[in-house]
């Protein structure tokens, strides 16, 4: 079997670490996640984010999950400054870094 590092995220603010691979978000509040730099030795780095809020009615209104580039960097996510993954119930996003300031959805 293959296992990947999994983090059950409940705080409303988090900076992804070098150990993170899969981040499951169970908080019912709005969540801001900061990505590591897409330029510092991260070519090919993969991160997976999954809304695991456990209620069938979906996330409460106003409780977006925002994925943000590294603070103080010029990094982009799909050419944008931030990415909201909570547009649907139980939404997810997988990102990879090109090692040159960009994160891409796949």
Where does each model-flagged region fall?
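Short C-terminal domain-edge/linker segments immediately following a structured domain
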Residues: 55-56, 85-91
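Terminal beta-strand-rich extracellular "head" domains
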Residues: 70-87
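Exposed extracellular interaction/assembly regions and N-terminal maturation sites
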Residues: 1-69, 98-106
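Extracellular disulfide-bonded cysteine-rich modules/repeats
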Residues: 88-101
